[in-house]
Amino acid sequence: MCGIVGLFLKDHSLQNQLGQLLSQMLITMSDRGPDSAGVAIYGEPANTESKITIQSDKQNNDFETLESILREKLDERLDISFKDTHAVIRANNTKIKFILELIENYIPTARVMSVGSSIEIYKETGMPSSVIDR
């Protein structure tokens, strides 16, 4: 069964506790069952860059392929970070469509979770506490 938690902080002094506060709220939803859990993380928007967050159950192979393909096909600086079964790609806004096409063509087992200047979405199957720990 689906359950959604959200936290809109009006008190900026709590910003550094956002992850902890949201995690506790999500874990409280555990009694709904081990279906799936996820979080959306918003950062400061970038003017000229966007982020693509992808997820793969075959991350060892997919992410190695992803990094290799992107470095081969793009002629500019690229920032990729890996977080368990997710990868976040930061690139110039003008390259986002091209990167999405590369992902679709070369890494069909990867799923695009989010695209945007400030958002990263992480989603997994399992108990919320397990998802948060990853």
Stretches found by the model and what they are:
Residues 1-134:
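N-terminal segments that mediate ammonia production and transfer
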